[in-house]
């Protein structure tokens, strides 16, 4: 299976890592900058979603976007047009609604807003349940970057671990 991961920041790296752990996939990455040496990808392209060749996506069985939210619609519409399953990390409810409406009208598969949590954390919890010898009745999940030691430092007065893109946050 050929999987494309667009955006190779922190979340893109994590997605590529998990794909390596979960299966034998051929992983393509695409970003507007060169890949760093820690990225475990099979192929990397430096590209701009807005200037992508019309048929570039056709070799992929799945496209995952870890791009900033304002680029998701552009990529999603191209995937929808080519009937390539698409998912993203979200970041904007109006963008996700636009993507979902387009997918419904063209009967294409999309999953939007699969960010850290809810989203990726839920997927990993389900995978853990599938691999446990006895399945518990409930899973309790917490999300947040707040450390247990809440004493602020001069370096970071909020003492908060930023695990997601703040693009579009007001």
Regions found by a protein language model. Name each.
Residues 109-170:
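Rossmann-like dinucleotide-binding core of oxidoreductases
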Residues 24, 82-85, 106-108:
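A short helix->loop->beta-strand "cap" motif at the edges of active sites that frequently abuts
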Residues 41-51:
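Rossmann-fold cofactor-recognition segment
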């Amino acid at each position: 299976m050929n999987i494309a991961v667009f955006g190779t920041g922190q979340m893109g790296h994590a997605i590529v890592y998990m794909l390596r752990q979960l299966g034998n996939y051929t992983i393509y990455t695409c970003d507007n900058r060169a890949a760093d040496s820690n990225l475990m990808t099979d192929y990397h392209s430096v590209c701009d979603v807005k200037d992508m060749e019309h048929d570039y996506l056709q070799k992929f069985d799945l496209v995952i976007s870890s791009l900033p939210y304002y680029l998701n619609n552009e990529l999603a519409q191209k995937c929808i047009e080519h009937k390539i399953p698409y998912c993203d990390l979200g970041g904007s409810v109006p963008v996700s609604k636009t993507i979902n409406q387009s997918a419904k009208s063209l009967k294409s598969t999309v999953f939007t807003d699969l960010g850290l949590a809810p989203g990726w954390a839920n997927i990993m919890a389900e995978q853990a349940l599938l691999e446990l010898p006895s399945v518990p009745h409930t899973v309790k999940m917490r999300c947040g970057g707040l450390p247990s030691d809440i004493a602020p430092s001069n370096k970071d007065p909020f003492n908060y671990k930023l695990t997601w893109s703040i693009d579009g946050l007001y």
